[in-house]
A protein has these predicted regions:
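A phosphate-binding glycine/aspartate-rich beta-alpha loop in the early core of alpha/beta enzymes
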Residues: 36-72
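Flexible, glycine/proline-enriched loop segments at strand-loop-helix junctions
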Residues: 1-2, 45, 70-77, 100-102
């Protein structure tokens, strides 16, 4: 029996395939997952809107593996989304790499997205 914060079997299986430089996409319901996630394994967690939150998923994943880099999508108007401070709190030793919308989509389509 797992005694870690993260116990979801599909996520644990996907993380077991990761190595240095692998990427994991954590997205909310607004992300065009079917079109912009390439061959990555998809794990659907939505129970109802906002549950679980992206930050909750990040915390659970971070509890079982090291995170080397964090890439986030720039907003259309260039403002910083309210969620960025939550990411920075969970990943205090990392700078958030801000990518434009289509650059972010391209990054999510890469072969190293698990």
């Amino acid at each position: 029996m797992l005694k870690t914060k993260l116990i979801h079997p599909e996520i644990m299986a996907a993380l077991s395939l990761c190595g240095h430089g692998s990427k994991v996409l954590i997205a909310d319901g607004n992300y065009p997952l079917a079109e912009k996630s390439g061959n990555a394994q998809k794990v659907y967690l939505g129970l109802c809107p906002g549950t679980p939150t992206v930050t909750q998923v990040l915390e659970a994943i971070h509890s079982v593996c090291e995170i080397e880099k964090a890439e986030v999508m720039k907003t259309p108007d260039g403002s910083e989304p309210e969620i960025y401070p939550e990411f920075k709190k969970e990943l205090p030793d990392l700078d958030l790499t801000v990518l434009g919308q289509y650059e972010f989509y391209d990054a999510c389509m890469a072969e190293n997205v698990v």
